[in-house]
């Protein structure tokens, strides 16, 4: 996609973000293009994204990841079940050294892709873990102030997995589908919800595609 810097700025303006307070890597255009190229190449060998979404990769995967940018600035971030590095890698590419990113993925083949593309793009402040999440976290898990996830599990399960890694005052920032309201209500009736403030749902639309961001802050 040509002139993706314009696309980034337009998207951030759409969500009401002042570009003057957002750190954007000056080489993010080229790095995002290379990331997409590598993702499509590797997708021929291993299942990183759905084949039907390849043609809309910029809106369906990249832009959808980057709507989290306002919520992670200056943070230590853990991306649970990152898969192809979504949303973690686009956030890290655009933010540069402004955030510290931890990517967690249990599939060894996907981890190989994450390590390959991170090295090729010379990404800094990033760690990759080949680990399985449990409700006790995982061996070597960092403490972070933001946990992200995209299309991984229900909110109840995501909070249980994230809780050991999330500091008090930190937040889960989750990309969810249309059933997120029911999932959030179910979580707020659970015992674990006592440790968290009431969740918030922020709705976005990208190229007629509805995207819901669920934000849950730990007390």
Swiss-Prot record:
Protein keywords: Cytoplasm, Methyltransferase, rRNA processing, S-adenosyl-L-methionine, Transferase
Main location as per UniProt: cytoplasm
Catalytic activities: guanosine(527) in 16S rRNA + S-adenosyl-L-methionine = N(7)-methylguanosine(527) in 16S rRNA + S-adenosyl-L-homocysteine
InterPro entries in the record: rRNA_ssu_MeTfrase_G, SAM-dependent_MTases_sf
GO cellular component term, pick one: cytosol
Pfam families the record matches: GidB (PF02527)
Signal sequence, renumbered to the chain: none
Cellular location(s): Cytoplasm
EC number(s) per entry: 2.1.1.170
Residues at which S-adenosyl-L-methionine binds: 81, 86, 150
Function: Specifically methylates the N7 position of guanine in position 527 of 16S rRNA.
Family: Belongs to the methyltransferase superfamily. RNA methyltransferase RsmG family.
Name the record gives this protein: Ribosomal RNA small subunit methyltransferase G
Organism: Magnetococcus marinus (strain ATCC BAA-1437 / JCM 17883 / MC-1)
């Amino acid at each position: 996609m040509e002139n993706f810097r314009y696309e980034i700025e337009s998207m951030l303006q759409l969500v009401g973000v002042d570009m003057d307070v957002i750190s954007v890597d000056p080489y993010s255009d080229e790095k995002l293009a290379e990331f997409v190229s590598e993702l499509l190449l590797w997708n021929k060998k291993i299942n990183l994204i759905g084949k039907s979404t390849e043609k809309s990769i910029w809106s369906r995967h990249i832009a959808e990841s980057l709507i989290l940018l306002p919520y992670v600035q200056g943070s230590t971030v853990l991306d649970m079940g990152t898969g192809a590095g979504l949303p973690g890698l686009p956030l890290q590419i655009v933010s540069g050294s402004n955030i510290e990113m931890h990517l967690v993925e249990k599939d060894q083949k996907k981890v190989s892709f994450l390590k390959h593309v991170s090295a090729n793009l010379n990404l800094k402040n990033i760690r990759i873990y080949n680990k399985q999440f449990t409700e006790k976290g995982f061996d070597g898990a960092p403490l972070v102030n933001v946990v992200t996830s995209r299309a991984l599990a229900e909110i109840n399960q995501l909070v249980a997995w994230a809780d050991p890694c999330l500091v008090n005052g930190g937040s889960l920032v989750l990309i969810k589908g249309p059933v997120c309201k029911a999932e959030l209500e179910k979580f707020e009736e659970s015992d674990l919800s006592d440790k968290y403030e009431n969740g918030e749902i922020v709705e976005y639309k990208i190229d007629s595609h509805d995207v819901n961001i669920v934000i849950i802050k730990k007390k």
